[in-house]
Swiss-Prot record:
Pfam families: GATase. Keywords: Amino-acid biosynthesis, Cytoplasm, Glutamine amidotransferase, Histidine biosynthesis, Hydrolase, Lyase. This is Imidazole glycerol phosphate synthase subunit HisH. It is found in: Cytoplasm. CDD domains: GATase1_IGP_Synthase. The gene is hisH. One of its GO terms (molecular function) is imidazoleglycerol-phosphate synthase activity. It comes from Bacillus cereus (strain B4264). HAMAP family: HisH. Its EC number is 4.3.2.10, 3.5.1.2. Coiled coil: none annotated. One of its GO terms (cellular component) is cytoplasm. Disulfide bonds: none annotated. IGPS catalyzes the conversion of PRFAR and glutamine to IGP, AICAR and glutamate. The HisH subunit catalyzes the hydrolysis of glutamine to glutamate and ammonia as part of the synthesis of IGP and AICAR. The resulting ammonia molecule is channeled to the active site of HisF.
Length: 209
């Protein structure tokens, strides 16, 4: 069972429909017990970083997400949800994030139109489970104005938009997609299937303990 975190700032319906399409079991929730009972977690997000962190704090979800990370449960952040995984952001004001990944969220400084919106090529930087079954250079759908300034060793895929934009990031059981898998057609469905596979593997490992 995958828990989609509902905190009022995500593409909940799009993610829900995508998981339904691939046949994944899921629940939309902000309940701590339900999140911790799940086998994997998706943190979606659309909007401003400071507001999102305020809402997560108000709903006591910051501690829950850190606990999810600590116990090794697979966690996938999408778009703003990915950005929230990092240590801090400069969006609107200096603001602390969840601190589950090293790095900071910064404004795109490019001559191109901002936000970076539309399809872009995703190039492989290193292997990790969410790449399974994907062709290097597949096109995915972006909508964002900020990017993750983070260590190279956690960047698994990049896109070019006047600069290299980390599209895929990962460290241990924590995964992030700056783009929207749920809006990226069959490529996105494969990515979500891959995450489902990671979740099932983690569930099996817990049953064998």
């Amino acid at each position: 069972m995958i828990a989609i975190i509902d905190y009022g700032m995500g593409n909940i319906r799009s993610v829900e429909q995508a998981l339904k399409y691939i046949g994944a079991e899921y629940i939309v929730t902000s309940n701590k017990k339900e999140i911790l009972r799940s086998d994997g977690v998706i943190l979606p997000g659309v909007g401003a970083f400071p507001k999102a962190m305020d809402v997560l704090e108000e709903r006591d979800l910051v501690c829950v997400l850190k606990e999810v990370c600590d116990i090794g449960k697979p966690l996938l952040g999408i778009c703003l949800g990915m950005q929230l995984l990092f240590e801090r952001s400069e969006e609107l004001k200096d603001c602390s994030g969840l601190g589950l990944l090293p790095g900071e969220i910064r404004k795109l400084k490019v001559s191109y139109k901002i936000p970076h919106m539309g399809w872009n090529e995703l190039r492989k930087e290193r292997e990790f489970p969410l790449w399974n079954g994907l062709v290097d250079g597949s096109f995915v759908y972006y909508v964002h104005s900020y990017y993750a300034d983070c260590p190279d060793e956690i960047v698994c895929g990049v896109s070019d938009y006047g600069m290299q934009v980390p599209g895929f990031v990962a460290k241990g059981n924590v995964f992030g997609a700056q783009f929207h898998p749920e809006k990226s057609g069959e490529i996105g469905m494969q990515i979500l299937k891959n995450f489902q596979g990671v979740v099932e593997a983690w569930k099996s490992s817990q049953l064998s303990i």
